[in-house]
């Protein structure tokens, strides 16, 4: 494989020295970019875009072509590819987000679910990873990703997005045996899926536990964290002669960082409700930290964006082990110039904290 020209993202995750704080952005290939909207229109719809390796590659690279400051690319895909490959029948309803034609509601439903083979059942994702790695040609590392078992389970049990997770939590408390069976099958599926991405060329992976923060502290430990630990334990950790770092991101998980730091991931993602300085004091000896600017800051003027970047950099302090990111994904209404101001500010203002 081609040598990396810019490896500061991987170095920061491994707590090795860097010249400036690396930066990337969740949903950096997305609807705020006019070029993304044009490619999506060409594809026809969101899933057609995900399932076309050439177009998925095109949108993955668009933010890198626009913003030379970006230190990583992230695979363009969706967390719900796994349940779709399990036969749940994913589709997107305008204005309502993702929906499933089949809903999981019993142990019998769960026992009937297959564990997808990454190359046979999710080959379009593996092909996209290979295509992106080839086209990147060592420019920056490529991040692969998956949803966490708990997060995927909520969609499968609810039949789509949910505000209160009523059905998922009812199963969790009323029929924990069924929920554990589903989570165990999903942990196997995610492990296999991420290992497929790593073999295809992903140089780091992130587990998105988007709905872990909806759980009580006890339920988080039993129904989310334990399954993410199983995944981390089963991942390929060395590939192409390099360590493959793992980032664990539980939105709303700021109270549980100490437990998360024990799972074996190299880094924890933080949402914007955490103070990154306090997080570093709590777990910074054990893990790198990624985050954690409020995505809404990008609606503000460039001077305000710069001030918030400066505040977060100062809160983290000197030294490596910080990957700058938003605390969640960029929203579609953001002016692309404001994203550019954000990336520029991170590199310009962080140099003083290194070296």
Swiss-Prot record:
- Indicate the quaternary assembly: Homodimer.
Quote the InterPro entries the UniProt record gives. Answer: UROD/MetE-like_sf, Uroporphyrinogen_deCO2ase_HemE, Uroporphyrinogen_deCOase
HAMAP family attached to this UniProt entry? URO_D (MF_00218)
Its source organism is Pseudomonas aeruginosa (strain UCBPP-PA14)
Entry keyword set: Cytoplasm, Decarboxylase, Lyase, Porphyrin biosynthesis
Domain of life assignment: Bacteria
Task: Fetch the PANTHER family from UniProt.
Answer: METHYLTETRAHYDROFOLATE:HOMOCYSTEINE METHYLTRANSFERASE RELATED, UROPORPHYRINOGEN DECARBOXYLASE
This entry carries the following GO cellular component terms, namely: cytosol
- Tell me what this protein is called: Uroporphyrinogen decarboxylase
GO biological process, any: protoporphyrinogen IX biosynthetic process from glutamate
Annotated positions binding substrate? 27-31, 78, 155, 210, 328
Q: Which residues cross the membrane?
A: none
């Amino acid at each position: 494989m081609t040598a990396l020209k810019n490896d500061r993202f991987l170095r920061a995750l491994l707590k090795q020295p860097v010249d400036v704080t690396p930066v990337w952005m969740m949903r950096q290939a997305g609807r705020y970019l006019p070029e993304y909207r044009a490619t999506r229109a060409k594809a026809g719809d969101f899933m057609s875009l995900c399932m076309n390796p050439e177009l998925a590659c095109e949108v993955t690279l668009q933010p890198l072509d626009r913003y030379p400051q970006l230190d990583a690319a992230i695979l363009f895909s969706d967390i719900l590819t796994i349940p779709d490959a399990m036969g749940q029948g994913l589709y997107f309803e305008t204005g309502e987000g993702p929906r499933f034609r089949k809903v999981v509601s019993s142990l019998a439903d769960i026992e009937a679910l297959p564990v997808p083979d990454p190359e046979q059942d999710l080959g379009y994702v593996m092909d996209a990873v290979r295509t992106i790695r080839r086209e990147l040609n060592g420019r920056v590392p490529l991040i692969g990703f998956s949803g966490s078992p708990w997060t995927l389970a909520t969609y499968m049990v609810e039949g789509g997005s949910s505000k209160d997770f009523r059905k998922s939590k009812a199963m969790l408390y009323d029929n924990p045996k069924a929920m554990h069976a589903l989570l165990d099958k999903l942990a196997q599926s995610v492990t296999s899926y991420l290992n497929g991405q790593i073999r295809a060329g992903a140089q780091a992976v992130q587990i998105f536990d988007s709905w872990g923060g909806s759980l009580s502290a006890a339920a988080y430990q039993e129904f989310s964290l334990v399954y993410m630990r199983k995944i981390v334990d089963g991942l390929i950790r060395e590939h192409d002669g390099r360590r493959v770092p793992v980032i664990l991101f539980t939105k709303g998980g700021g109270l549980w960082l100490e437990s998360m730091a024990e799972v074996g991931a190299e880094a924890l993602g933080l949402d914007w409700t955490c103070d990154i300085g306090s997080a570093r004091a709590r777990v910074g000896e054990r893990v790198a930290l990624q985050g954690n600017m409020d995505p809404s800051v990008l609606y503000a003027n460039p001077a305000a964006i710069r001030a918030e970047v400066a505040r977060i950099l100062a809160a983290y302090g000197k030294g490596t082990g910080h990957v700058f990111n938003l605390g969640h994904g960029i929203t579609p209404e953001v002016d692309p110039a404001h994203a550019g101001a954000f990336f520029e500010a991170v590199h310009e203002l962080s140099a003083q904290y290194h070296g």
